[in-house]
Design a protein with these regions (language model features):
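Ferredoxin-reductase
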Residues: 2-87
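FNR/FR-type flavoprotein reductase catalytic core
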Residues: 75-140
């Protein structure tokens, strides 16, 4: 787990009340496991003591980036929609947090089931399973 300042590379709407944020976070991208998450201090909300947890939707080790898929449900997530490339998640982004999931070693087929924004962390597991040659069915 690391504490870093993470520049925003992209942040755009992908659906009704759904946004996808790309952050430069090579230390996290290189060590994140499916099911792990990050704690984010949202700029402009430094008065709030607790950081907010967000699942990591995708990670690109070669680019050193992570992607956060989030739903706008309140003041904090509404504030996140205003972040633009060049803004920084500061003072710190903490992660990866949690134990995460590991694909079974001997697995031929897998069924991944998720709903809403809670399905976001399944994407990393999907990628890992497909790379291992597993036949994956996804139900969202």
């Amino acid at each position: 787990m690391v504490d870093i300042t993470a520049p925003v590379l992209d942040n755009h709407q992908v659906g009704p009340r759904l946004h996808l944020m790309t952050l430069s976070a090579p230390e996290i991208a290189s060590s994140i496991k499916p099911g792990q998450f990050v704690h984010m201090q949202i700029p402009g909300m430094e008065g709030h003591i607790l950081r907010r947890p967000f699942s990591v939707y995708a990670a690109d080790v070669s680019e050193g980036t992570i992607e956060i898929l989030y739903q706008v449900v309140g003041f904090g997530s509404e504030r996140m929609t205003k972040l633009a490339p060049g803004d920084e998640i500061a003072p710190k982004l903490i992660g990866p947090v949690g134990h995460g999931w590991a694909a079974p070693e001997k697995c031929e087929r897998a069924l991944l089931v998720g709903g809403g924004v809670g399905a976001a962390p399944l994407f990393l597991l999907f990628e890992q399973l497909v790379a291992a040659g597993v036949d994956v069915t996804v139900v969202l």
